Amino acid sequence: MAVMNIEYYSEVLDMEWGVTVLYPDASRVTEPDCTDIPVLYLLHGMSGNQNSWLKRTNVERLLRGTNLIVIMPNTSNGWYTDTQYGFDYFTALAEELPQVMKRFFPNMTSKREKTFIAGPVSYTHLTLPTTPYV
């Protein structure tokens, strides 16, 4: 499993945004032209960042040998919401991030039924409204 740290300019947030991605071993990608690898958006908790799951859990070991892309964005303490006087983390997470990640990883699924989201209960509930991918 490859671990990639990606920083890209987010137009929604108007700043550089950090994302850590776990990408399956090439041997786990069943077909070279596969465009349907499932994806998990793994959200961190308060005071965490895009690397919290790697540093504080066995997520990399648990996912080794699976055919799953895991995307862990950094939202600081943004609570995954759009705010009037802060950042629009919900829009960035639900709309912009899947599109950007699809450009980085063209074989990542676009299917809603193969797109998952997880994280601390107190935050994940904020991401449940209907969105294009998440």
What are the roles of these predicted feature ranges?
Residues 35-45:
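Short beta-strand element of the alpha/beta-hydrolase
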Residues 1-30:
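N-terminal cap/lid segment of alpha/beta-hydrolase-fold proteins
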Residues 46-67, 73, 78:
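Short substrate-entry loop that stabilizes the transition state in hydrolases
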Residues 85-106:
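Alpha/beta-hydrolase active-site loop
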Residues 124-130:
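Conserved small/polar residues in nucleotide/adenosyl-binding loops
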Residues 74-89:
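Active-site catalytic motif of lipid deacylating hydrolases and related acyltransferases
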Residues 108-121:
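Alpha/beta-hydrolase fold nucleophile elbow
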